[in-house]
C-alpha cells in the first residue's frame, strides 16, 4: 500500500495526462468518425486533399517528391510550399500500412492530425513545467486537449494539414529550448559539453528544424528566440539570466536546426519565406552567428571590457543594441531582397483587399463591418481566453517581482502570438497553446490560494488544514473554465468538413468522362522538373486543358478529378479585372461573354465548374478579388427582402425603406449587374444567354431541397416560392440567413420581379443542382436572313439534365443589316448526359423554324445557313 501511495505521489501527473489523452481521442477521433468514414473516406477542408495528392505521388516515387506541380495553377504550375515533414510522415505511414492510394491511403492520413492533436499535450506540459511548475503543467496539458475552435478543427480526424504540426513543433521548440537553458544555467562550459548536457540543445535544434520542415515560414521561431536573448541582455540589470549559457544553448540549437533543414534548402529558385529555399537556411545560420556574437559580448562583459572603455554597466546592453542595429542595416544594404523577405512576414498581420475575404485571414477581433467583437475569442478558446488573459497579466506582475528569464521569454512569445492573432484569425491555432498555458497558471494559483491542492494532498494521506468553502469555490472556478470550453469543443468536433457528396460525385464523373483520362492519371503520378520561373506556361508532354472554378475547389479538382485547375487555395490563378489579369475572379465576374472568352482563351479553359456557394455567398469574395477592395464589390448587390407585419413579402432598396417592425431577411439581393455576370448566367440561368458554354453534368440538389422534394413539387413555381419564403422568414426570426438552395430560389424570384423584362432571359423559379459542370465549345454558328422589320432573333430549346431536371435554354441576338447570327452550344447527339430533348426553335417575328444540331457542328464551329 505504501509503495502504491509513494508511486502515485511521484507519478500522479501521468494519470491526468492519460485522462487528457482519452478526452482528446474522444473529441478528435470518435466524435467526427461518421463524417469522415462515410460514402467515401472524406478528408476535411481543402489543403488536406493537396497533401493527399503529394503523398500519393511521393509513395509512387519514394523517396523522391515533387517540389513543382504543373497540375495546378494551370497552365503555369505552382512551386510547392507544403513541407517535407508531413509529406514523408504520410508517405511512410501509407507504405507501412500498405495503403498507397485512394480510399485506403486517405483512411491512414485521416488519423495523422488527430494523433498530432492528442500528442500536443506533451510539449504543452513540457513548456509549462519549465516556466512554471509541474502542477500548472498538468493543468495546461489537460486544457490543450479541450480547447475548441481552430486548434481543435485543425487537429481533428480527416484534417491532414500541417497546421497542427506547426503548433506542435513550435511549442516543442520553445519547451526544449527552455529545458536546455534550465539544464545548462549555472554550470561551466566543461560540464555542459558532456554528452548528456549537449543532448538538450541538440533536441531543441531538431524540434526547430522539424518546425521549419512542417511550415517553411517556421523560421519565425529564430527571431522569437533572438528576442528572448535581446531582452535578456538589454535588461541585464533587471532580468535574472545566465546570459553566457543562454547564448551557447542558442548557438547549438540554431546550428543543429540548420543541419536538419539543409537537405531541403534548395528546392526553390531564389529566396522565399514560404518555399523551401536558402532563405530559411541563412536565417538559421545567421541566428547561430548572432547568438555567438551575444556570447562574445557577454565574455567581454565578464572581463570588464566595457568598464575599461568607460561605458560602465550600460556598455553591454548598448553593445547588443548597436549589434542588432548593425545587423539589420547590413541586411538592407548588402541583401535588400533578403531583408524584404524577412519583413514580408509582418504583412501577415495586415491582410488587405481580396485576402480579407479568406475566412482564416480576416482580423480576429473584428466583424466584417469593422466592429470589435469577442465572439471569436469564445468560439475558438471558450472560457480559456479570459482565464488566459488573466494568467498573462498575473505572469507579467510576477515577472516584475521575480525577474525570471523563462517567464519573460514566455511572455514575449505570448505577446507575439497575440499580435499574430489580432491580424489573422488563422493564428488561433497557435494562440490555443498560449490560452492553455496561461489559463493553467491562473487556475494553479487559484487552486493554491483556495486550498484545492491541499484537499487533493489530503486525499492521499496528507493532513493539511483547509477551508472547505475555499475548496468549493476553487471547484466552481475550475468548472467555469472547463465545462463551457469542453461543451464548445464537443459540439464543434462532430463534423470534419471536406467536399460534400455532390462535389465528390461531380469530380468523380469528371475524371471518368472527360477526355484523356488515362494520360492525366499517368501524368498525375510522375515527377516533374522544377523550372527557374513559372511566369510562362509550362511545357506539358501532351495536349492539355484547364478547369476553371473558384480557388477554394482547386485541390479537390486536382486530387479527385485528376484534372488541372486554374485557381487553387494557394490563391494562385485568381486574377482580377482592375489590372486585366486573367483568372477565376475575372472570369466569373465578367459582365459579358466576350470578356470571359478573353480570359478563357488566355488560360486554355475547357471546363467550368460552378456550385451554389459561388452563385450565392462566395460571389462576394469573387467580386472583391476581381475589383480589388471590399467597397468596390458592393455594386453587385442591391436591396433586401422583408416580411411586413401585415403578412406581405416585399423588396426594399435599402433598410431605411423597410416598414417598421418588419422581419428583414438577412440576405443581400443582387443588383442588375450581378445577373449579367458569367456566374449568374452559368449557375442561375443554367447557361442561357451564352454561346460557348453548355452544361454537361449536374449534381443532386442541395440537401435541404432534396428533403423538401418529398413534400413539394419542384416543378411547381408557386409551391417552390412559398416554401422558400417560409424558410427564409422562419430563419430570419433568429437572425439566420436562408439556406443556399433557398438563396438561389430567392435570387431567381428577385430577378423575375426586377430585371427579367429588361434582360430578356426567362428563368424558372426552382432549385437546381449543387454543382454544375460546363464545357467550353466553339458552338454551331447558325446564320441567315430575316424580314426587313425584324430587329432580333430568339432561340430556345428544352434541356434535360442527368438529374432529370428540365430547363429552357434561351438566347437572343440582334439583327444587323437584315442578317442574324447565333452560336449554339448544345448538340442533340452529344455523348454527355445533359442535352436538348426538343429541337432548337428559332424565331424571327412571326416566323419560327426548328433545327437539330450535331456534335461535330458544335465542336468544329460549323456554319449553318438558315433563312427566316
Swiss-Prot record:
A motif (DXD motif 2) lies at residues 161-163. The record marks 154 as: Important for catalytic activity. InterPro entries: AglB-like_core, AglB_P1, Oligo_trans_STT3, OlisacTrfase_arch, STT3_N. A motif (WWDYG motif) lies at residues 550-554. A motif (DKi motif) lies at residues 613-622. The record marks 47, 360, 618 as: Interacts with target acceptor peptide in protein substrate. A motif (TIXE motif) lies at residues 357-360. Pathway: Protein modification; protein glycosylation. Keywords: Cell membrane, Glycosyltransferase, Magnesium, Manganese, Membrane, Metal-binding, Transferase, Transmembrane, Transmembrane helix. GO terms for biological process: protein glycosylation. Residues 37-101, 154-162, 213-215, 263-279, 331-373, 424-427, 495-868 are extracellular. A glycophospholipid binds at residues 81, 162, 426. It is found in: Cell membrane. A motif (DXD motif 1) lies at residues 45-47. Pfam families: AglB_core-like (PF22627), AglB_L1 (PF18079), STT3 (PF02516). One of its GO terms (molecular function) is metal ion binding. Its EC number is 2.4.99.21. Changing residue 81 to E: Complete loss of catalytic activity. Mn(2+) binds at residues 47, 161, 163. Changing residue 360 to A/N: Complete loss of catalytic activity. One of its GO terms (cellular component) is plasma membrane. Despite low primary sequence conservation between eukaryotic catalytic subunits and bacterial and archaeal single subunit OSTs (ssOST), structural comparison revealed several common motifs at spatially equivalent positions, like the DXD motif 1 on the external loop 1 and the DXD motif 2 on the external loop 2 involved in binding of the metal ion cofactor and the carboxamide group of the acceptor asparagine, the conserved Glu residue of the TIXE/SVSE motif on the external loop 5 involved in catalysis, as well as the WWDYG and the DK/MI motifs in the globular domain that define the binding pocket for the +2 Ser/Thr of the acceptor sequon. Oligosaccharyl transferase (OST) that catalyzes the initial transfer of a defined glycan (a glucose-linked heptasaccharide composed of 3 Glc, 2 Man, 2 Gal and a sulfate for A.fulgidus AglB-L) from the lipid carrier dolichol-monophosphate to an asparagine residue within an Asn-X-Ser/Thr consensus motif in nascent polypeptide chains, the first step in protein N-glycosylation. Belongs to the STT3 family. This is Dolichyl-phosphooligosaccharide-protein glycotransferase 3.
Amino acid at each position: 500500500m505504501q509503495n502504491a501511495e509513494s508511486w502515485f505521489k511521484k507519478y500522479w501527473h501521468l494519470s491526468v495526462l492519460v485522462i487528457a489523452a482519452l478526452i482528446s481521442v474522444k473529441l478528435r477521433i470518435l466524435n467526427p468518425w461518421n463524417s469522415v468514414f462515410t460514402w467515401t473516406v472524406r478528408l476535411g477542408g481543402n489543403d488536406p486533399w493537396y497533401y493527399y495528392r503529394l503523398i500519393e505521388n511521393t509513395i509512387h516515387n519514394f523517396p523522391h517528391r515533387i517540389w513543382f506541380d504543373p497540375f495546378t495553377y494551370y497552365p503555369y504550375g505552382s512551386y510547392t510550399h507544403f513541407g517535407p515533414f508531413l509529406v514523408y510522415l504520410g508517405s511512410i505511414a501509407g507504405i507501412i500500412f500498405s495503403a498507397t492510394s485512394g480510399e485506403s491511403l486517405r483512411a491512414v492520413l485521416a488519423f495523422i492530425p488527430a494523433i498530432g492533436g492528442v500528442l500536443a499535450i506533451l510539449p504543452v506540459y513540457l513548456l509549462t513545467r519549465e516556466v512554471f511548475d509541474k502542477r500548472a503543467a498538468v493543468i495546461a496539458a489537460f486544457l490543450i486537449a479541450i480547447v475548441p475552435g481552430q486548434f481543435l478543427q485543425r487537429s481533428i480526424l480527416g484534417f491532414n494539414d500541417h497546421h497542427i504540426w506547426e503548433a506542435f513543433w513550435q511549442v516543442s521548440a520553445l519547451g526544449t529550448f527552455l529545458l536546455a537553458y534550465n539544464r545548462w544555467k549555472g554550470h561551466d562550459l566543461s560540464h555542459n559539453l558532456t554528452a548528456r548536457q549537449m543532448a538538450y540543445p541538440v533536441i531543441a535544434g531538431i524540434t526547430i528544424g522539424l518546425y521549419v520542415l512542417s511550415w517553411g515560414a517556421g523560421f519565425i521561431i529564430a527571431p522569437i528566440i533572438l528576442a528572448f536573448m535581446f531582452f535578456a541582455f538589454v535588461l541585464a540589470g533587471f532580468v535574472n539570466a545566465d546570459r553566457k549559457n543562454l547564448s551557447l544553448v542558442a548557438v547549438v540549437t540554431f546550428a543543429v536546426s540548420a543541419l536538419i533543414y539543409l537537405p531541403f534548402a534548395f528546392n526553390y529558385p531564389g529566396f522565399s519565406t514560404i518555399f523551401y529555399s536558402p532563405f530559411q537556411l541563412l536565417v538559421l545560420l545567421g541566428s547561430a552567428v548572432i547568438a555567438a556574437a551575444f556570447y562574445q559580448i557577454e565574455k567581454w562583459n565578464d572581463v570588464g571590457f566595457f568598464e575599461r572603455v568607460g561605458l560602465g554597466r550600460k556598455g553591454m546592453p548598448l553593445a547588443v543594441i548597436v549589434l542588432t542595429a548593425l545587423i539589420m542595416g547590413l541586411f538592407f544594404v548588402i541583401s535588400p531582397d533578403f531583408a524584404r523577405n524577412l519583413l514580408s512576414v509582418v504583412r501577415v498581420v495586415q491582410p488587405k483587399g481580396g485576402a480579407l475575404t479568406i475566412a482564416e485571414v480576416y482580423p480576429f477581433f473584428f466583424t466584417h463591418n469593422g466592429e470589435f467583437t469577442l465572439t471569436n475569442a469564445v468560439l475558438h478558446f471558450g472560457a480559456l481566453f479570459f482565464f488566459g488573459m488573466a494568467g498573462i497579466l498575473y505572469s507579467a506582475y510576477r515577472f516584475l517581482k521575480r525577474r525570471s528569464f523563462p517567464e519573460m521569454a514566455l511572455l514575449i512569445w505570448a505577446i507575439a502570438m497575440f499580435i499574430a492573432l489580432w491580424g489573422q484569425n488563422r493564428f488561433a491555432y497557435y494562440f490555443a497553446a498560449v490560452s492553455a498555458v496561461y489559463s493553467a497558471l491562473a487556475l494553479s494559483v487559484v487552486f493554491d490560494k483556495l486550498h484545492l491542492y491541499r484537499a487533493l494532498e489530503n486525499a492521499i494521506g496528507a493532513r493539511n488544514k483547509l477551508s472547505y468553502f475555499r475548496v468549493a469555490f476553487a471547484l466552481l472556478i475550475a468548472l467555469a473554465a472547463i465545462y463551457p470550453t469542453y461543451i464548445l469543443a464537443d459540439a464543434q468536433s462532430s463534423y470534419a468538413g471536406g467536399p460534400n457528396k455532390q462535389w465528390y460525385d461531380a469530380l468523380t464523373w469528371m475524371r471518368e468522362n472527360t477526355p484523356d483520362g488515362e494520360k492525366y492519371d499517368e501524368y498525375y503520378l510522375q515527377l516533374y522538373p522544377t523550372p527557374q520561373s513559372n511566369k510562362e506556361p509550362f511545357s506539358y508532354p501532351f495536349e492539355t486543358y484547364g478547369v476553371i472554378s473558384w480557388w477554394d475547389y482547386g485541390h479537390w479538382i486536382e486530387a479527385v478529378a485528376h484534372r488541372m485547375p486554374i485557381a487553387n487555395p494557394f490563391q494562385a490563378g485568381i486574377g482580377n479585372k482592375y489590372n486585366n489579369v486573367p483568372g477565376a475572379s475575372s472570369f466569373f465576374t465578367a459582365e459579358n461573354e466576350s470578356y470571359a472568352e478573353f480570359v478563357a482563351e488566355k488560360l486554355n479553359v475547357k471546363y467550368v465548374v460552378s456550385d451554389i456557394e459561388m452563385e450565392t455567398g462566395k460571389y462576394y469574395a469573387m467580386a472583391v478579388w476581381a475589383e480589388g477592395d471590399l467597397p468596390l464589390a458592393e455594386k453587385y448587390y442591391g436591396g433586401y427582402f422583408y416580411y411586413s407585419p401585415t403578412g406581405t413579402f416585399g423588396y426594399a432598396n435599402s433598410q431605411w425603406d423597410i416598414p417598421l417592425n418588419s422581419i428583414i431577411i438577412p440576405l443581400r439581393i443582387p443588383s442588375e449587374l450581378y445577373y449579367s455576370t458569367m456566374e449568374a448566367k452559368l449557375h442561375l440561368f443554367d447557361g442561357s444567354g451564352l454561346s460557348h458554354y453548355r452544361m454537361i453534368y449536374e449534381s443532386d440538389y442541395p440537401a435541404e431541397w432534396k428533403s423538401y422534394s418529398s413534400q413539394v413539387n419542384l416543378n411547381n413555381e408557386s409551391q417552390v416560392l412559398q416554401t422558400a419564403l417560409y424558410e427564409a422568414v422562419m430563419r430570419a426570426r433568429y437572425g439566420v440567413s436562408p439556406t443556399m438552395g433557398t438563396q438561389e430560389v430567392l435570387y431567381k424570384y428577385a430577378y423575375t420581379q426586377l430585371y427579367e423584362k429588361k434582360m430578356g432571359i426567362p428563368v424558372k423559379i426552382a432549385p437546381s443542382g449543387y454543382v454544375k459542370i460546363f464545357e467550353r465549345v466553339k458552338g454551331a454558328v447558325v446564320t441567315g436572313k430575316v424580314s426587313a422589320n425584324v430587329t432580333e432573333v430568339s432561340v430556345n430549346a428544352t434541356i434535360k439534365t442527368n438529374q432529370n431536371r428540365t430547363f429552357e435554354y434561351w438566347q437572343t441576338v440582334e439583327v444587323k443589316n437584315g442578317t442574324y447570327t447565333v452560336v449554339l452550344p448544345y448538340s442533340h447527339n452529344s455523348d454527355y448526359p445533359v442535352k436538348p430533348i426538343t429541337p432548337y426553335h428559332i424565331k424571327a417575328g412571326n416566323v419560327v423554324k426548328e433545327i437539330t444540331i450535331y456534335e461535330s457542328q458544335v465542336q468544329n464551329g460549323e456554319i449553318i445557313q438558315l433563312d427566316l
